Amino acid sequence: MVKRSRATRLSPSIWSGWESPQCRSIRARLLLPRGRSRPPNADCCWNQLAVTPDTRMPASSAAGRDAAAYDAWYDSPTGRPILATEVAALRPLIEVFAQPRLEIGVGTGRFADLLGVRFGLDPSRDALMFARRRGVLVANAVGEAVPFVSRHFGAVLMAFTLCFVTDPAAIFRETRRLLADGGGLVIGFLPRGTPWADLYALRAARGQPGYRDARFYTAAELEQLLADSGFRVIARRCTLHQPPGLARYDIEAAHDGIQAGAGFVAISAVDQAHEPKDDHPLESE
């Protein structure tokens, strides 16, 4: 069972240099929700690193290839119950961490919207337009070079992001930089060797657009990558035992731990260098 966090509340701060001339280049690339010209309540800070063309990458997810079709799938008879199933697995892990929260690889903003994540970034501008309409404050950037100041986020979410990342160690270094004391990383992924991951791995092997560069990990491999990057896994949940290709899907309950055959796994981890000195706010029993 996951217990609610007693992490220190993050103090509000200003978006650094928002009105300064130095920030004009990055302001031009920020995609704020419609009608919003300034960040509300200044929960978090942008730094003055402009997202220049050399820090941008080609679309690194299926959402970047065809954002409209990708987003519409979540409203389909298949997509709706699967989305609800995956969100139910992620929610208890991310809700224990303080605001503000950031999603790396936010895509069209489906998960951010449902999980209370206010900030997101993605290399696909097309996908970000959907996220912006959902009220997410977004930036056209990649997880290896995040335009936010350090130690300001209570949680960083990566849902279906790591399989498209070429350098996991780099993105984990940035995540550690971004997390405030007591904050945590929450990852949702398709474990290699399960029917759903195998389906997308086959598409990747065939060079299908949007999947060509995908790489999948087992839970053990991912946990080792996290450990090598200075994280400690503190909770695990799994769901989605229904295989691909069914005519109808039901919303599944999530279970603590990792079960054989589960098509979706959610993991939360904390930076070992910045854990609370007493008991940790997250516990798995």
UniProtKB/Swiss-Prot annotation:
MF (Gene Ontology) = methyltransferase activity; S-adenosylmethionine-dependent methyltransferase activity
Q: What induces it?
A: A member of the dormancy regulon. Induced in response to reduced oxygen tension (hypoxia), low levels of nitric oxide (NO) and carbon monoxide (CO). It is hoped that this regulon will give insight into the latent, or dormant phase of infection.
In this record, what's one Pfam family?
Answer: Methyltransf_11
Q: Which residues form a coiled coil?
A: none
Which protein family is named in the record? Answer: Belongs to the methyltransferase superfamily.
Q: What is this protein called?
A: Uncharacterized protein Rv2003c
